[in-house]
A protein has these predicted regions:
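C-terminal accessory/tail domains of diverse enzymes
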Residues: 1-33, 44-297
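A short beta-strand motif that forms the metal-chelation/ATP-contact edge
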Residues: 36-41
Length: 297
């Protein structure tokens, strides 16, 4: 109830102040503002943080997000990929998965004593972007138990691959999903035998709405099997907003559908900016999905 009241109030006050959580691009496409809807998870004190008390919880979240790329791309913003503000672990470096599996093996089982600094030491150099920036990561642990000082030892985890959705209830469904996943992995840790090697499939398949939807439905099925009554229909607005339909038509029983897809826009190397506050990207390419039904193979 508190989350509902606060989130709804925030959106209402923004609307009254003539602020919007959506915008339209030059070509008329309806999109998000680009503002982050980052979720910071933790406890009232570092000692209360579930990620310091149970580091296997963080391991479960990272591994589950890696197994289901739809969680990385469905809720993110316009800029995705290895040079974005929240790259996946397997987007940053090709060899990171092998090292991540070694890091996971260093996290003791549930019930054993775990020093609070251990999580930072084993994951700090892996949860980064291609330049080694620890802040630009899908799972940011800068404020978990950093050796830099007390301001970095708050027991907080920041999930950055979320853009501000246009409606308060869309944000609330995201929050509900995260809270349910934490409850699920607290009771039953997610420990795959081996992390998936997606390779080029990551951007060949999961940039398309068809594969994102199929993968996310698998997530919903697994949540239901774990005792959390989620429905994929709750996230239908997220799909329509993330992958708007351009149009469809039918010819002699054959149906065509054209829908927006995702495209990683990489940072350009020849464009500089004073102070480094601006990073130019190559947005010259866009991807679309063409889906055909009723055609003979």
């Amino acid at each position: 109830d508190q989350l509902v009241d606060q989130t709804t109030h925030l959106y209402d006050v923004a609307h009254v102040s003539r602020l919007s959580t959506e915008k339209f691009m030059v070509d008329g496409r309806h999109t998000g503002t680009g503002g982050g809807n980052h979720f910071v998870l933790g406890g009232a004190t570092p000692n209360d943080s579930p990620f310091l008390r149970r580091p296997d919880l963080l391991r479960s979240l990272i591994a589950y997000w890696h197994t289901h790329p739809s969680l990385s791309y469905l809720f993110s913003g316009l800029f995705i990929g290895p040079t974005s503000q929240a790259p996946r672990v397997d987007e940053a470096r090709n060899d990171s998965l092998y090292e991540l599996e070694i890091a996971f093996s260093q996290i003791p089982p549930v019930g054993e004593y775990i020093p609070p600094w251990l999580v930072d030491r084993v994951l700090r150099n892996l949860l980064t972007d291609v330049t080694g920036n620890t802040h630009r990561s899908e799972f940011c642990i800068d404020k978990l138990f950093s050796p830099d000082g007390p301001t970095g030892r708050l027991g907080l985890l920041e999930l950055r691959a979320f853009e501000m959705p246009p409606h308060a209830r869309m944000s609330l469904t995201q929050q509900l999903l995260l809270r349910a996943m934490i409850a699920r992995f607290w009771e039953e840790p997610y420990v795959p035998a081996r992390l998936a090697r997606w390779g080029t499939e990551l951007h060949d398949r999961f940039m398309l709405p068809f594969y994102v939807e199929q993968d996310f439905r698998d997530v919903m099925d697994e949540m239901q099997a774990a005792g959390f009554p989620f429905k994929a229909e709750w996230f239908a607005p997220h799909f329509e907003f993330r992958f708007p339909k351009y149009g469809d038509f039918a010819v002699k029983g054959i149906e065509f559908e054209l829908r927006h897809a995702l495209e990683p826009w990489h940072v350009m190397g020849e464009e500089g900016a004073a102070g480094g506050a601006v990073r130019y990207v190559d947005s010259s390419v866009e991807r679309v999905q063409v889906r055909i039904k009723g055609m003979a193979p």
